[in-house]
């Protein structure tokens, strides 16, 4: 079970929280789901270079609060909060009229321990034509140096421009996917190369004391 399912979803009742925090009836539920998807899609595209680890959306009454967890808060906020105001205005066009939109920026203090950021970094290095093995091993070393218990990386596609697609796995330390108490983070990214897309999956097991800081 632990090998097949998404590690974050698998641990939701134990040591993970939902990234969409709200309740809705049957009529408004589809609208909220669509809005959340569009908001996340817009933020990830707009802040592609800002190292956004996750986006948490909270709804209460007519208020929509969006928490952006990023390793580069300065890029998100901008000079005199100009960039943040622009993001807020564009999000207001996505959500239903009459709703109050609040955008909070939270700094990620340990980007090397965020699986999504590690996966995106590896994918970016592959797109820049860095050898995939070198990119993966360097990312794994940085993660272990940051205090991780273990890391597992799976890279699949036409690796190195090969004619036949294949998958390779790299592992260091301990990543207990079946242990619900273990704080395992998961991330996925795609590298768009001349030969085609290369998928990168990353699992990171963090220490309990670090997990309380990272969230």
UniProtKB/Swiss-Prot annotation:
The keyword Ribonucleoprotein applies. One of its GO terms (biological process) is translation. The keyword Cytoplasm does not apply. It comes from the Bacteria. Residues 39-109 form the KH type-2 domain. InterPro entries: KH_dom (IPR004087), KH_dom-like_a/b (IPR015946), KH_dom_type_2 (IPR004044), KH_sf_prok-type (IPR009019), Ribosomal_S3_C_sf (IPR036419), Ribosomal_uS3_bac-typ (IPR005704), Ribosomal_uS3_C (IPR001351), Ribosomal_uS3_CS (IPR018280). Keywords: Ribonucleoprotein, Ribosomal protein, RNA-binding, rRNA-binding. One of its GO terms (cellular component) is cytosolic small ribosomal subunit. GO terms for molecular function: mRNA binding; rRNA binding; structural constituent of ribosome. Binds the lower part of the 30S subunit head. Binds mRNA in the 70S ribosome, positioning it for translation. Part of the 30S ribosomal subunit. Forms a tight complex with proteins S10 and S14. Belongs to the universal ribosomal protein uS3 family. NCBIfam families: rpsC_bact (TIGR01009). This is Small ribosomal subunit protein uS3. The gene is rpsC.
